[in-house]
């Protein structure tokens, strides 16, 4: 098993698969699992006109997932085209302020549910570069956490990833 080998399980899936992931996390509590890209709340195709409904459903599912102490979350990937913000088609990419205005509610909800000690920022590059530049994305993360404590910022920008992935000796 992954847990027996001190390995983690990362998953990237779409919002309509969140309940299956919750079942998996509950079934194998000894395995450390990482949810990538927020469980991607889709905003394209048949989902493009349901952003508010999907957000409400997603919020409820993330609260439920946060009850699984073996689950951590990577906060990033919302700039990719799948989420339906349309930045990859725009005349110019969003500024960090525009990014924060559009996506703050997703980030803050995850941090509220899981706590900074179970969240880590991630860039999802090179895919995100279709919509946003690397420096602008990380500046947006800094703006999102402007009112956070030094310990909370340390967890989000480095500490959680260091601990979960055993990046130190």
Regions found by a protein language model. Give the residues of each.
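Mid-to-C-terminal alpha-helical segments outside catalytic/metal-binding sites
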Residues: 105-109, 113-120, 127-169
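Catalytic pocket-lining loop regions of alpha/beta-barrel enzymes
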Residues: 1-120, 131
């Amino acid at each position: 098993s992954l847990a027996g080998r001190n390995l983690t399980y990362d998953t990237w899936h779409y919002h309509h698969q969140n309940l299956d992931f919750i079942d998996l996390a509950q079934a194998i509590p000894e395995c450390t699992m990482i949810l990538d890209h927020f469980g991607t709340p889709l905003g394209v195709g048949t989902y493009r006109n349901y952003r508010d409904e999907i957000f409400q459903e997603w919020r409820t599912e993330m609260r439920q997932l946060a009850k699984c102490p073996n689950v951590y979350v990577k906060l990033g990937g919302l700039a990719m085209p799948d989420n339906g913000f349309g930045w990859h088609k725009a005349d110019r990419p969003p500024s960090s302020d525009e990014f924060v205005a559009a996506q703050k509610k997703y980030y803050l909800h995850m941090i509220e549910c899981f706590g900074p000690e179970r969240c880590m920022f991630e860039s999802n590059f090179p895919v995100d570069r279709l919509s946003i530049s690397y420096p602008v994305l990380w500046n947006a993360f800094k703006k999102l956490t402007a009112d956070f404590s030094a310990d909370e910022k340390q967890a989000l920008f480095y500490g959680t990833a260091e601990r979960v992935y055993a990046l130190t000796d």
